């Protein structure tokens, strides 16, 4: 049945009265209620709202992926204009017909790339599969196009990456592979569910530009699901604000930012961390928690003077971590990824040291090496005066009670067969810290501290949104009262209101228990708020380290200045000028086996502030 007359000529998508529910304990739980919106050709519609507000399930309903998960979807109208200009009713399509629609006419970039990529196929095979299926290309043609797409999303050594598996890539790299896969068939509608959450600010700027370029070329409609209001200001034409499964406000990006009508929209905008808000301040400060009823009311910020003088709790010297790459008929190691090269730093009790840098710069590998989750080839790691890089596995388990890790991908770090209560209680049982009833009470307390309900303990990971899963991982890391927490992008998946609550919780625990944080992040506004000191990493080496105020207010290294310049501004009229060109090459940290890389020499430029001298300013700016 043709539907061309039902869809306005300029629209590529129209949704009327979308209702989504899930069955739980024989009860119907509404996730989305009476949602209606349209999308014009070449337009970007940003859907914003809290974690659990219904943003992602709306996208999954459009892709017809909810039926398999037991979702109940009802909709008066769900019309899509295909690339062929035919208009179809999505709810009327069979499973076989939808396979031809997904990827070709409507593509989706998922929030968690590790769980969206097939672990048993190489990156090249997965991108080429979509191209072969929808463009009738040969295997050779598809692989050539796959390499071109990896080049477009700024992945260095694209030819090498084609033959790698997802687990061999960083989180940001995996996200870029997902973006390349979604864009490879030039769909009529692109649904991007938090596509830049795992990306650093410079790559984020390039990906946003890439989506804009392809959108203009193909007159592609884009639905951009995000909690980053800076990204919304930069990319959106219209904004749809969701709260508890309903649309509470919609309008142009200028209307939403300059004249928000709904209290929740005003609260959402007021909670956005602004780069430069800590100017003139030496210590971390809590985020003001803004209520829905009183969006303009802010509690006075409290300075966090928590650093304990004396010996550092963690001392790292000349840490080296490399990964072998095999090639040739004999599958010999011919090259190595120099992930971490001679990295040194100290961490004091009660201090937050933030590691920042681009995806693939070695931030996460540094954190994993400290817990021996990856083996290092050189250097010393000393915790509480004891060298831990040479400990036996038995002694290492006891150490992990004092050093906990919050992983970047929450779904991959939670056991899908265990309830989240069992996942949180597991470390308490392993280390024999609390008896049964006390452990259960501890789980309930932890869930409440991270903004969840105690009864959530009986649910499974797939029943939560991405942001809620990240809060569960934070609760599990806090269960043992560790001395050091390594937080790898711990708040990147959270919306601004929950992010503020979690960071305030981390600061409170730091004040109460003297916990030291190694905070790995690409969100410069959050780093500015939470950090005592900041270390900037580039190609596996620290190129600038110092007090947070010195690094942010007086950045000395050109790469640090580049990172700060790339931060999106949550103001549509103050859009950042595009400084990073998609045609530029990213340097590679892959070298021949045995080849040594010159270690950077840090020079003191102020109290505790050390900077490497770049060989070429142009190499870091890449304008």
Swiss-Prot record:
Its EC number is 7.4.2.10. Disulfide bonds: none annotated. Pfam families: ABC_tran, oligo_HPY. It catalyses: glutathione(out) + ATP + H2O = glutathione(in) + ADP + phosphate + H(+). InterPro entries: AAA+_ATPase, ABC_transp_ATP-bind, ABC_transporter-like_ATP-bd, ABC_transporter-like_CS, Oligopep_ABC_C, P-loop_NTPase. The keyword Ribosomal protein does not apply. GO terms for cellular component: plasma membrane. PROSITE patterns: ABC_TRANSPORTER_1, ABC_TRANSPORTER_2. It is a peripheral membrane protein. It comes from the Bacteria. Keywords: ATP-binding, Cell inner membrane, Cell membrane, Hydrolase, Membrane, Nucleotide-binding, Repeat, Translocase, Transport. ATP binds at residues 49-56, 357-364. GO terms for molecular function: ATP binding; ATP hydrolysis activity. It is an enzyme of class 7 (translocase). Residues 15-269, 314-564 form the ABC transporter domain. It is found in: Cell inner membrane. CDD domains: ABC_NikE_OppD_transporters. The complex is composed of two ATP-binding proteins (GsiA), two transmembrane proteins (GsiC and GsiD) and a solute-binding protein (GsiB). Belongs to the ABC transporter superfamily. Glutathione importer (TC 3.A.1.5.11) family. NCBIfam families: PRK10261.1, PRK10419.1, PRK11308.1. Part of the ABC transporter complex GsiABCD involved in glutathione import. Responsible for energy coupling to the transport system. This is Glutathione import ATP-binding protein GsiA. It comes from Escherichia coli O157:H7. The gene is gsiA.
């Amino acid at each position: 049945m043709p539907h061309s007359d039902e869809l306005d000529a300029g629209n590529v998508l129209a949704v009327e009265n979308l209702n989504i529910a899930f069955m739980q304990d024989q009860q119907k739980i509404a996730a989305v209620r009476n949602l209606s919106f349209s999308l014009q050709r070449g337009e970007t519609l940003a859907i914003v709202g809290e974690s659990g507000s219904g943003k992602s399930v709306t996208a999954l309903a459009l892709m017809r992926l909810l039926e398999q998960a037991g979702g109940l979807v009802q909709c008066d109208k769900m019309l899509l204009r295909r690339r062929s200009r035919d208009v179809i009713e999505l709810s009327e399509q069979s499973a076989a017909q939808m396979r031809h629609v997904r990827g070709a006419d409507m593509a989706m970039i998922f929030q968690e790339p590790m769980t969206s990529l097939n672990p048993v196929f190489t990156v090249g095979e997965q991108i080429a599969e979509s191209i072969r299926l929808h463009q009738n290309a040969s295997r050779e043609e598809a692989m050539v196009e796959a390499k071109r797409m990896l080049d477009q999303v700024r992945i260095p050594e694209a030819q090498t990456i084609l033959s790698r598996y997802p687990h061999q890539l960083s989180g940001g790299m995996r996200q870029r592979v997902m973006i390349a896969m979604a864009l490879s068939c030039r769909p009529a509608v692109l649904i991007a569910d938090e596509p830049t959450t795992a990306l650093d600010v410079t790559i984020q700027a390039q990906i946003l530009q890439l989506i804009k370029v392809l959108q203009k070329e193909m007159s592609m409609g884009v639905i951009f699901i995000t909690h980053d209001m800076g990204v919304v200001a930069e990319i959106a034409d219209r904004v749809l604000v969701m709260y508890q499964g309903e649309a509470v406000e919609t309008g142009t990006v200028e209307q939403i930012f300059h004249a928000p009508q709904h209290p929740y929209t005003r609260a959402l905008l007021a909670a956005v961390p602004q780069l430069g808000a800590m100017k003139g301040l030496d210590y971390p400060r809590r985020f003001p928690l803004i209520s829905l009823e009183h969006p303009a009311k802010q509690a006075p910020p409290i300075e966090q003077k928590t650093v304990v003088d004396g010996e550092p709790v963690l001392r790292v010297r000349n840490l080296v971590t490399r990964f072998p790459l095999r090639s040739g008929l004999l599958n010999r190691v011919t090259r190595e990824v120099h992930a971490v090269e001679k990295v040194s730093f100290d961490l004091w009790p009660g201090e937050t040291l933030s590691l920042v840098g681009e995806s693939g710069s070695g931030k996460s590998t540094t954190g994993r090496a400290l817990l021996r989750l990856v083996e290092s080839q050189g250097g010393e790691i000393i915790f509480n005066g004891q060298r831990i890089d040479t400990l036996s596995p038995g002694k290492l388990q006891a150490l992990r009670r004092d050093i906990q890790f919050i992983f970047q991908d929450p779904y991959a770090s939670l056991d899908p067969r265990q309830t989240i209560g069992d996942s949180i209680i597991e470390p308490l049982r392993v280390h024999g810290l609390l008896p049964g009833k006390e452990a259960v009470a501890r789980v309930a307390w932890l869930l409440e501290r991270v903004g969840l309900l105690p009864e959530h303990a009986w649910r499974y990971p797939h029943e939560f949104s991405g942001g809620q899963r990240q809060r569960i991982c934070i609760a599990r890391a806090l269960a043992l009262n560790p001395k050091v927490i390594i937080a790898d992008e711990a708040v990147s998946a959270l919306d601004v209101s929950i992010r503020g609550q979690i960071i305030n919780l981390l600061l409170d625990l730091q004040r109460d228990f003297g916990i030291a944080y190694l905070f790995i992040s690409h969100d410069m506004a959050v780093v500015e708020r939470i950090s005592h000191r900041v270390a900037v990493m580039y190609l596996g080496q620290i190129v600038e380290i110092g007090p947070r105020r010195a690094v942010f207010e007086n950045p000395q290294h050109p790469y640090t200045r580049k990172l700060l310049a790339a931060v999106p501004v949550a103001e549509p009229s103050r859009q950042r000028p595009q400084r990073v060109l998609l045609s530029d090459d990213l340097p590679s940290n892959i070298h021949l086996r045995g080849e040594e890389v010159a270690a950077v020499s840090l020079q003191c430029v102020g109290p505790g502030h050390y900077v490497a001298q770049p060989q070429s300013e142009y190499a870091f700016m890449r304008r």
